[in-house]
Structures are given as structure tokens and as C-alpha cells.
């Protein structure tokens, strides 16, 4: 389901039967409709980025709801798929901040310790936020709480009002928060563009002795 260290720590935060409730939810929704991402990618963020290697969290809201887009990592799509508008703007800001990245698949970020987590881990086809408020938020809040309890600094990148509300869960003063409006076309020009989240995250990581992320990889 998830990387074992994540599983053990999250289990301490959630009610005892919560994993069972999640599995029942997944059985039901995947049996009765088209749901993204593919079921074996639902927990991909926690499988690719182990707890002990997490240096940065980029929090999304829910997966892309179109065919072949969602792959279990927030904002990421396969390289064969055109970049959705929010990802286009992320890559545009990255180009202005650090340099040009030609890949839409953000897996290499995840492999370097960037946890690409959505607050909701599933979505019904064609219905953005269609699974909001049903099962996922306590689980993904638990992920943030587990990171908050770490004794090694984490950089939390929070884009948009929804993600920024999660700042209330980040109470440990050793951590760092970078926040701005969302990269969506509706809000990117209100302060996402020019916010330089990638170079700012690297400056923090370097200062903390944790090594920089190669955002262009």
C-alpha cells in the first residue's frame, strides 16, 4: 500500500480501522466507475518517496480527472501527455527561476525526496474534487503530521488557498513553508509567477545541509 515507514507512522495518527476503510472505499469506487489514477498508482507518492528521504512536500488538491493524465504524483503527467495548464505554469515559473525542464513527468523530483502529494488521492473521471470530503483528507493530513513530527527540516511548498490552509498542521519550528497563489491559470498571475519556489527551496535545503534538488532533471 505505502512504503513501510510511512505506513507505520501514519497508522499511529489515524483511527485504528482507517486503512480498512480506505480499502473498502477503493474497492467500491473502482468497481463502479472510472477513477484516476489507476488503482496501483493511488499511493505512488508514498511509494516513490520514502519518509526518511523526504526533504520537500509539494501539496496538490486532487488528481487530474482526464484519461491517461494522473499517475499518482501531484501535478505530474506522463511525458507522452500534454502538460495541463497548472503544470504548464509550474514549468514556466521553473524556467524563469532556474532553467528549462522539458519533461512533464515529475518522477525524478519524487526520487530525489520531493513528496508530490495530493490531498485527495483519487478522482472520478471528469469530476474535479469528486472524492473530496469522503475519505482522503484525514489520511493526507496524517502524512503532513508525520512530516511535522520529523526532527529533520522539511520544506513545505503550498500553492493556493486550499493547500495554504494545511499550514495549520505545520507547527514544528524547524520546518520551512513556501506559499503562494496556485499555478492555475485563474490565479498564477496573482503571485505564483515570480515567487521562485524552486530556488528558494534549494537555498533552504543548502542552508540546512540537506543538499539541493535538481529540479531540471
UniProtKB/Swiss-Prot annotation:
Taxonomic source organism: Streptococcus equi subsp. zooepidemicus (strain MGCS10565)
Alphabetized CDD domains for the sequence: UDG-F1-like
Chain's role: Excises uracil residues from the DNA which can arise as a result of misincorporation of dUMP residues by DNA polymerase or due to deamination of cytosine.
Residues at the active site: 62
Catalytic activities: Hydrolyzes single-stranded DNA or mismatched double-stranded DNA and polynucleotides, releasing free uracil
GO cellular-component term (any): cytoplasm
Protein encoded by which gene: ung
Protein name: Uracil-DNA glycosylase
UniProt keywords, alphabetically: Cytoplasm, DNA damage, DNA repair, Hydrolase
GO process annotations (BP): base-excision repair, AP site formation via deaminated base removal
GO molecular function: uracil DNA N-glycosylase activity
Signal peptide extent: none
Amino acid at each position: 500500500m505505502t512504503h513501510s515507514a510511512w505506513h507505520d507512522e501514519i497508522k499511529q495518527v489515524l483511527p485504528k480501522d482507517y486503512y480498512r476503510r480506505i480499502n473498502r472505499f477503493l474497492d467500491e469506487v473502482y468497481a463502479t466507475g472510472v477513477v484516476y489514477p489507476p488503482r496501483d498508482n493511488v499511493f505512488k507518492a508514498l511509494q516513490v518517496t520514502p519518509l526518511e528521504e523526504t526533504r520537500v512536500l509539494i501539496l496538490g488538491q486532487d488528481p487530474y480527472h482526464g484519461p491517461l493524465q494522473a499517475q499518482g504524483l501531484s501535478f505530474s503527467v506522463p511525458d507522452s501527455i500534454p502538460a495541463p495548464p497548472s503544470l504548464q505554469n509550474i514549468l514556466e515559473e521553473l524556467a524563469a527561476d532556474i532553467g528549462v525542464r522539458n519533461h512533464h513527468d515529475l518522477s525524478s523530483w519524487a526520487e530525489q525526496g520531493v513528496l508530490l502529494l495530493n490531498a485527495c488521492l483519487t478522482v472520478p473521471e471528469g469530476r474535479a474534487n469528486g472524492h473530496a470530503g469522503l475519505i482522503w483528507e484525514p489520511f493526507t493530513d496524517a502524512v503532513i503530521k508525520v512530516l511535522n513530527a520529523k526532527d529533520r527540516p522539511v520544506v513545505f511548498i503550498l500553492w493556493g488557498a486550499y493547500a495554504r490552509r494545511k499550514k495549520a498542521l505545520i507547527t514544528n519550528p524547524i520546518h520551512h513553508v513556501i506559499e503562494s497563489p496556485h499555478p492555475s491559470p485563474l490565479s498564477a498571475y496573482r503571485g505564483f509567477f515570480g515567487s521562485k519556489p524552486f530556488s528558494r527551496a534549494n537555498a533552504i535545503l543548502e542552508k540546512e545541509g540537506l543538499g539541493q534538488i535538481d529540479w531540471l532533471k
